[in-house]
Amino acid sequence: IADLGGLRLALRALKATDGFNSTGLIDGFTPVQRFFLSWAQCWRQNITQERSLQLLTIDPHGPNELRCNGPLSNMPEFHEEFGVQETDPMYKPEPMRVNIW
């Protein structure tokens, strides 16, 4: 819940900046696409399966992959910016998307 809410607020803050509309494509990505790519970079990890299983028992947070992909798949902006289709792994039908705050 907090990850999704925080991501929504951060995207809203990005869109409210003075330079948001003046920043065009960089390396072929829009500002919003770069925002989502930065989010994904935050959650990257190189971890063994053993350590991953250990974290499931001691860490109150979900696995990084779920913390990254869960909020993204619930955001219409993500679907729009990347043209996510029904056949894509990150696709979530609109009625199934969580909308908090």
Predicted regions and their residues:
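Zinc-dependent metallohydrolase catalytic domains
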Residues: I1-W101
